[in-house]
Amino acid sequence: MLENAFIMLAIIFSVNVIYVSLMTVRMILTLKGRTYIAAFVSMFEIVIYVVGLGLVLDNLDQIQNLVAYAIGFGTGLVIGAKIEEKLALGYITVNVVSANPDLKFTQRLREKGYGVTSWSSYGREGDRLSVQILTPRKYELRLYETIQEIDPKAFIISYEPKRIHGGFWVKQVRKGKLMNPKKKKNTNTVESENEQK
């Protein structure tokens, strides 16, 4: 009897972890505009939800089942968030302000395959170089490391753009083929492609 009770708790906990993980991922996919994938995930999500809820409702007199359900819910949220971090869907825009306008910031970032826009700006203590970079979220940490290598004192702020329209990278972004900074094309190849256009 006790063994069956533990099995029931484990099933309720596991079902809810899976359900909430899928729910979290589905919500994030929806927010990122991946509607069809989100709809596909939701089919599995609702089946698991009904099974888990049914197990709890059939045994409402057992408080431990409700506790397992609640703990599974919280655990599922954490796991869902971790899955989203690993998937790193979408893009980020990083704005960088360097106190040293003479640094070859733009050139070095472009050599690594990033889409870069730069302009001269003026801060409290004089001239600045402002740089805006668009990159897939999965390359975010690598970009920060590159920026720190170029200018350890650079001011960095990042945000997630809601819409991307126009500009050099739009076709690649729409196809999900924004260049991987790790696998940068050979400069000669890029130049020859530009000449052909």
Swiss-Prot record:
It comes from the Bacteria. CDD domains: YitT_C_like_1 (cd16381). Keywords: Cell membrane, Membrane, Transmembrane, Transmembrane helix. It is a multi-pass membrane protein. GO terms for cellular component: plasma membrane. The keyword Transmembrane applies. The chain crosses the membrane at residues 5-25, 37-57, 63-83. It is found in: Cell membrane. Coiled coil: none annotated. The keyword Cell membrane applies. PANTHER family: UPF0316 PROTEIN YEBE. Belongs to the UPF0316 family. This is UPF0316 protein OB0738. It comes from Oceanobacillus iheyensis (strain DSM 14371 / CIP 107618 / JCM 11309 / KCTC 3954 / HTE831).
